[in-house]
Each structure stands twice: as structure tokens, then as C-alpha cells.
């Protein structure tokens, strides 16, 4: 009897990289642009402080500096910027090793453009099969629905499935209901 194929499905944010690094990348890009356009230096540190305090960063900087920008413009920029991100060495080695013997998939909630920019910046296309990457906006289902997991199970039948994520309240519910180790 042949051993079953292993399918390892990862979450993206705060599993393969720290999502705060995406936030810092976006804030850096915005701070640089605002400094160049409006002459306001050192805005990154302020933005990070406001974020850590739980304040609405975009509303705060717009009102504090009288910027002729809208929250919607800054939010769009945040979501669509091309981030500067890097996998840490241990994560890269793990993915390299696993990709030699397992099918690697990804299931992530979020906007397609944002998640795809993150994956490209991290170089994840080298490890993950394109048909095994599921983004909630693209498929119309979140990880709280069993549908994305069932889709991968249909694509890779007769396999053993593992799910790796960071949020037990969100990431593990459906995989556990379907009998996958998490």
C-alpha cells in the first residue's frame, strides 16, 4: 500500500511572516510620500505610536497636519502597496524541506491584491502550488466556512491534510471538524 500524499495548508498572516511587518512597510511608504509631497518629516514613528495606542492612524495624521488626503485614499494605498517583506531563514528552510515531499497550500482571509502582494514579496510562489492557494476574496468564502478546505480535499483526494495557522478561534475550526490535524 502506497503512503498517502501529505498536503500541508498554511495560513499567511502571522504564520509565515509577522503581519506587523506589512503594516510597517505600508506606513513607511506613506510616510515617505507624505514627507516628499508635504514636507512632514519623521511621520513613520508617529504613525506607529498612534497604531500602538489603538488610535485611527489615518484620521489622526490627516487632522493633525491638515493633509488634503482622505482616509479612503490612505486605506487604498495601505491595501494595495507593494510591500518590502522577507521570510525569515527558518521559515524559508522549512518550506523548502516540506515542498520536497508534500503539496503546500495556502488558505488566507483578506483582499486578493493585498495577499498576492505579500506572497510575491515573500517569494512564496517558489513553494506553493498555484492551484492550492485560496484567498477568501477570490473564492467568496472565509476560513470559517468548510468550503475552501473541501475544495482542496477534492483537488488532492486520498491525502492526509495538515493545517498550520496562528489563530485557534479562526484557523482551526473547519480543519478540525473535517478531521485534519492542526
Regions found by a protein language model. Give the residues of each.
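Glycine-rich phosphate-binding loop signature in dinucleotide/nucleotide-binding domains
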Residues: 2-4, 100-102, 154-159
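Substrate-recognition element of Asp-dependent hydrolases with the DxDx(T/V) motif
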Residues: 71-84, 91-122, 132-136
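Generic enzyme active-site microenvironment
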Residues: 9-11, 107, 164-165
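Glycine/Thr-rich beta-alpha phosphate-binding loop at enzyme active sites
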Residues: 129-144
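N-terminal helical cap/lid subdomain that shapes the substrate entry/recognition surface
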Residues: 3-93, 100
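Conserved Lys-Pro-Asp/Glu-containing loop-to-beta segment of HAD-superfamily phosphomonoesterases
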Residues: 141-173
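Conserved H-loop
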Residues: 68, 125-129
Amino acid at each position: 500500500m502506497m503512503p498517502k500524499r501529505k498536503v500541508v495548508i498554511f495560513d499567511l498572516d502571522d504564520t509565515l511572516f509577522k503581519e506587523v511587518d506589512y503594516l510597517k512597510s505600508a506606513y513607511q511608504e506613506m510616510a515617505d510620500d507624505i514627507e516628499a509631497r508635504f514636507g512632514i518629516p519623521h511621520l513613520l514613528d508617529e504613525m506607529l505610536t498612534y497604531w500602538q495606542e489603538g488610535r485611527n492612524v489615518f484620521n489622526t495624521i490627516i487632522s493633525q497636519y491638515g493633509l488634503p488626503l482622505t482616509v479612503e485614499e490612505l486605506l487604498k494605498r495601505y491595501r494595495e502597496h507593494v510591500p518590502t517583506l522577507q521570510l525569515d531563514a527558518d521559515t524559508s528552510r522549512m518550506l523548502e524541506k516540506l515542498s520536497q515531499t508534500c503539496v503546500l497550500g495556502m488558505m488566507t482571509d483578506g483582499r486578493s491584491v493585498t495577499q498576492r502582494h505579500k506572497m510575491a514579496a515573500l517569494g512564496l510562489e517558489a513553494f506553493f502550488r498555484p492551484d492550492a492557494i485560496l484567498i477568501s476574496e477570490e473564492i467568496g468564502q472565509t476560513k470559517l466556512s468548510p468550503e475552501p478546505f473541501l475544495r482542496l480535499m477534492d483537488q488532492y483526494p486520498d491525502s492526509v491534510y495538515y493545517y498550520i495557522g496562528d489563530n485557534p478561534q479562526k484557523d482551526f475550526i473547519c480543519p478540525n471538524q473535517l478531521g485534519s490535524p492542526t
